[in-house]
A protein has these predicted regions:
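A short helix->loop->beta-strand "cap" motif at the edges of active sites that frequently abuts
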Residues: 67-72, 90-91
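Glycine/threonine-rich flexible loop motifs
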Residues: 36-55
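An anion/phosphate-binding loop that grips the pyrophosphate of nucleotide cofactors and donors
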Residues: 29
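Extracytoplasmic/secreted envelope proteins and their assembly/folding machinery
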Residues: 19, 26, 59-62, 104-108, ...
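Short, flexible loop segments at the rims of nucleotide/cofactor-binding pockets, characterized by
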Residues: 9-14, 50-53
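Secreted, periplasmic, or luminal enzymes acting at the cell surface/secretory milieu
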Residues: 77-182
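Short, small-residue-biased leader/transition segments that mark boundaries at the very start
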Residues: 1-8
Length: 182
C-alpha cells in the first residue's frame, strides 16, 4: 500500500507536485483508491449548500488518475448527494457519508473484502443540481424555503419530468445473491 495527499484540507487548491505524485503512484498500482468528499467549507452546520459540486482539486485528481489506471475506486465522505461527473470513468464508488470515529475500520473491511457492502442509498443522487426537485425554489429568502414541488418529490418528480437520476433512492450493490423458493 502506498499513498499520496493531493488537496490541502478544506481548500479547493490543487498542488501540482502532489497531483503529479498521485498520478505516478496510480500508474504503477493495480488499483487506485481515492478518498474524496466535501470539506467543511462546502458543507457544514449553519448554512445551506449553494451547489452539489465536489472541490475542483478532487475532480481533477479523479480525472487524471482515471486516465492512467482503469481500476479506480472512489470512497466518498459527504453529508448528502454530490454531483459525480466521474461516475462512468471509475470501477466503483463507495458512499460512506459521515461515518464517525470507526469509519476507517469499516472502509478497510469493505475495500479488502472482509465485509460485504450491503447499504442502500437513503436519498436520490441526481446527475446535477438542476435535476433536484427543490432546485426551482431554492434558495428562497433568508428565513424561508418554499417547497412548492408538492407531491412531486423523490421518484414522483423524476418520473413526472422524465429525468433519470444518477443513483435512485435505494440503490446499492452487494456481492450477495438471493434466491427465494418454497
Amino acid at each position: 500500500l502506498v499513498g499520496s495527499e493531493m488537496c490541502i484540507r478544506d481548500s479547493d487548491e490543487t498542488v501540482d507536485e502532489l497531483l503529479d505524485e498521485a498520478v505516478e503512484l496510480a500508474k504503477n498500482s493495480d488499483v487506485a483508491v481515492i478518498f474524496a468528499g466535501l470539506p467543511e467549507s462546502f458543507e457544514s452546520e449553519g448554512f445551506d449548500r449553494k451547489h452539489m459540486r465536489m472541490p475542483d482539486c478532487q475532480l481533477k485528481l479523479i480525472d487524471e488518475v482515471a486516465k492512467v489506471n482503469e481500476n479506480v475506486v472512489i470512497v466518498l465522505h459527504n453529508g448528502s448527494a454530490v454531483e459525480m461527473p466521474f461516475a462512468d470513468k471509475v470501477k466503483g464508488i463507495l458512499e460512506m457519508y459521515l461515518g464517525g470515529q470507526n469509519i476507517g475500520t469499516a472502509e478497510k473491511a469493505l475495500l479488502f473484502g472482509e465485509a460485504n457492502p450491503s447499504g442502500k442509498l437513503a436519498e436520490t443522487f441526481p446527475e446535477k443540481l438542476s435535476h433536484n426537485p427543490s432546485y426551482l425554489n431554492f434558495p428562497g429568502n433568508m428565513d424561508d424555503v418554499d417547497y412548492a414541488e408538492g407531491i412531486f418529490v423523490g421518484y414522483r418528480y423524476y418520473d413526472e419530468k422524465g429525468i433519470k437520476p444518477l443513483f435512485p433512492f435505494g440503490h446499492g450493490l452487494s456481492y450477495t445473491t438471493f434466491e427465494y423458493s418454497n
